[in-house]
Structure formats: structure tokens, C-alpha cells
Amino acid sequence: MSPGEKATILARVETLTWRKRKALAELGIARSSYYRWRRGRSGAKERKRPWNRITPNEERRMLAVAREFPDLSSRQLSALITDNEGFAVSESSGYRILRREGLVKRQETQVMAADEYHNKTRRPHQMWATDASYFRVVGWGYYYLVTVMDDYSRFILGCKLQKDMSANSLIEVVQEAVDATGMTDVPVEHRTRLLSDNGAGYVSRVFRDYLRLVGIGHILAAPFHSQTNGKVERYQQSLKREVNQLPYELPSQLERAIADFVEYYNYRRYHKALGNVTPADVLYGRREDILRRRKEVQAQTIIHRRQYNQALNTEPVNTAPS
């Protein structure tokens, strides 16, 4: 029963000079409820809305975005809405609404990159990380996806399916990253370093000679400790989780699926460790402007919600009997 209906019943019963008990019985209202309403304990008065409650229009728009992008978590959805919808919604508020509507994304189990390389990078291209992961193509056997990631921004600079893990196959992908970034045009003292595991191709003389030729230093991860290269390991887990949902009968099909994921990961996936911006935002120096704009949107949202909810709280409740 709404507060307005309770107020109407109170007004009607108060006009009776006798037989209030009978009137309440006919209305199906317990006497205890009637006297509790009179004391204002249960909401015969309109309950005040919290000043920061999300507005109905904001909730409708948030749910529309959630249904358009069903794979986004409440954290990613919060960032997407703040960047594109003109209002902000917190991760916790978004989660409560998504849970109520049955739209909560399944929690993913991920390997944390806490034990990453001990010297943390402070700028893009200070260090790259490389690793490989295998994929099966039906009727074609196994392929190795060799990846080069910028450690600071987590941007994927190069990746390619290779038939083996030979030094030349690895060099081909590293050269792709070198060409994309113009690394050989950078003064030698400012060029990147490359972090890799101790695989045979990476520790070979051919690979070492190549790195020396392009002026890139080489860092080997601690043996039997894959989390030293944890960022690229975690990326590969995310990639395989998405790409391996379907079998592939041609290498070109797998290449297309990988390319689509890399484009999404680099340019559209909000990364928690990066402040809920994309790797491209960090690589190209856009992160601080984005975070500043988000604070402005959040401040404007707070002002609007306060005004909206305070206006509702001051509206009079009609208690006159009809």
C-alpha cells in the first residue's frame, strides 16, 4: 500500500466518531497498523528519497546500454556511461541495478599480475613484453600466436600466428612492433627493452643478434615464474577465453577472430589497472584528460540528482478523502 493510500485511510477513519474498529475490520486494516500509521512509523508520510538516488531516466538509459553491451561488467559499464551518456553511475549502484534486472555478468577468474617485473615502468615504450600462446585449427594442427605488448599501457604493438617458435618467427613479430612505433628512429639510450621468457627461440644467438642490431635491450623473466611476465600472460588468458569459444577450420578464420579481439582490447576495453581507460588512451596520452572529464560529469550528476530528489521530497502528499 502506498503512502498516499495510507494517508487517505487515516483521513477517512479520523472522521468517524465511533465504530472505528468495525471500519478498520471492513477495510481489512489491523488496529495495530492503524495506530502505527498515526504515529508515522510505517510511511503514512512519504518516505524521503536519498539525495543521491539515481533518477528513473538515468536508470532507463543505463539498462538500455547494459542490454546493448551485455558482456560489460558493472565497472566497464560505469566507465562507458560516464564517457558517453552525459551522466555518471557508480560501479556499486550499477551492480545493484543489474543484479535486480538479472543482467549481472559472470565474474571472471583471472591471474593477477601482482608479481610482475619488479621495476615498474613509468612511460610508454620503456619496456615491451613478449610471449606466445598456442591455438588449434581443425585439420591444420597447432599455431603459435606471438604477441608484443607495451608494458606501461598494455597496448598490443604486434601479434601474428606462426607455425613455430623459431627465432625468425619471433623476430618477425618484434619487427612488426619496431616498425609500428618507429623505434629505430629513437636515440639508442631511449629505446625500449624487451622482456621475454627463457624459451629456446628467445635465448638463441639469432634472436640476441637481432636485438643488438635494432638497439633493443633484452630482459629474461625469472625461470619457472611466469608471473614475472604477468601482464601479457593475463592478456593471453583473456584472448583465449574469447577466441576459443568456436572451432576454426582455416587459419584465416582464427586470424580474423584474433584481430577483432586485439582491436577491441586496444581501443574499447576499459582496463581497471589503467584507471578504467583503454590501452590506447594511455599509449597516446589521453588518460588524464579522460579522468578529468569524468570528474566533471560526476560533479554535474551529483548536482542534478540532488535537485531532482529534493524536489520530489518537497512535493505535498494529498491526504484529502475522495
Residue ranges and their predicted role:
Residues 88-91, 103-104, 117-145, 151-264:
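RNase H-like DDE/DDD metal-dependent nuclease/strand-transfer catalytic core used by mobile genetic elements
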Residues 38-127, 283-290:
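Basic, flexible linker segments flanking DNA-binding modules
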Residues 33, 76, 93, 206, ...:
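Ca2+-coordinating acidic residues in Ca2+-binding motifs
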Residues 11, 22, 79, 96, ...:
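Surface-exposed charge patches
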Residues 5, 58-59, 73, 187, ...:
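N-terminal alpha-helical segment
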Residues 17-19, 72, 249:
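Residue-level signal for the short linker/turn that defines the boundary of a DNA-recognition helix
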Residues 1-47, 52-68:
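Residue-centric detector for conserved, function-critical "anchor" positions
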Residues 212-216, 237-322:
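C-terminal domain-tail junction helix/linker
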